């Protein structure tokens, strides 16, 4: 599918982003809050065609609906300061206008003879180009990042696989790798050398020190310096702090993938 964006250009446009998902719920049932919170929104680069802004939307499935919206970013004439998530102060130099979300049902996709072009892959993230568009953080002053890519069927873990990636840091540090309610600590050597990391489900522990059984149904993947794991409701366990304060420059990552055993 191709989406066309009609944006107000009476004010200079800094850039346009298009996000889309096939995790939208259209079955008429009560909202699946877990799915709603875990949806993975793909980013689609925007270009111009015959004087209009357009974006191609490669799909993985014809059995799920398509939800899509656009963000249009404009520069502010003067900076504006305020308070954001968790009362953190900020100064904005631009503002964002989001479109109304457009929805295409499975029947509409099939009637339009939409083609599926995405295939399963073990490479979850190459950390190239605009990769940050598909990751997020509630604390932009820190380097820690999260993604729901692992919730998408395109990146389903093969049976018996490990999650692997490479990381490079200037100083020795303790890296926290998180999956849902579990996390693992990884000792980094530093010295600006690429270090290969491989982790099994049992390397991830929750606040009760219980290991992750397998990769099935995982929803969120995180990389950070520290995080606090919360025990489930009714548990006698206490919150568990994982990791340590970061030293030096933010780390670099490459080749996040599932590695078959």
What are these regions (language model features)?
Residues 63-77, 219-223:
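Short, aromatic- and glycine-rich surface loops/edge beta-strands on solvent-exposed regions
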Residues 123, 135-217, 222-240, 246-260:
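Extracellular ligand-binding interfaces
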Residues 77-121, 247, 254-255:
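Short beta-strand elements
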Residues 1-20, 30, 39-51, 56-58, ...:
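Surface beta-strand/loop "capping" patches
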């Amino acid at each position: 599918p191709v989406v066309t964006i009609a944006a107000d250009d009476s004010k200079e446009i800094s850039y346009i982003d298009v996000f889309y998902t096939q995790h939208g719920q259209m079955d008429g049932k009560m909202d699946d809050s877990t799915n709603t919170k875990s949806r993975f929104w793909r980013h689609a680069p925007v270009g111009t065609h015959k004087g209009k802004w357009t974006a191609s939307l490669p799909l993985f499935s014809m059995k799920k609906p398509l939800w899509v919206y656009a963000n249009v970013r404009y520069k502010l004439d003067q900076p504006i300061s305020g308070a954001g998530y968790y009362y953190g102060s900020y100064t904005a130099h631009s503002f964002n206008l989001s479109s109304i979300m457009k929805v295409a049902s499975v029947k509409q996709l099939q009637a339009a003879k939409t083609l599926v072009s995405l295939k399963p892959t073990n490479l979850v993230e190459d950390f190239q180009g605009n990769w940050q568009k598909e990751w997020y953080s509630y604390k932009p002053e820190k380097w820690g990042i999260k993604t729901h890519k692992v919730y998408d069927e395109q990146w389903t873990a093969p049976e018996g696989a490990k999650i692997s990636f490479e990381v490079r840091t200037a100083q020795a540090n303790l890296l926290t790798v998180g999956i849902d309610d579990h996390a693992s600590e990884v000792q980094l050597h530093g010295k600006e050398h690429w270090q290969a990391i491989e982790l099994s489900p049992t390397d991830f522990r929750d606040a009760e020190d219980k290991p992750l059984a397998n990769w099935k149904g995982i929803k969120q993947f995180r990389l950070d310096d520290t995080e606090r794991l919360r025990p489930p409701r009714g548990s006698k366990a206490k919150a568990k702090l994982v990791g340590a304060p970061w030293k030096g420059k933010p780390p670099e990552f490459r080749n996040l993938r599932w590695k078959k055993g």
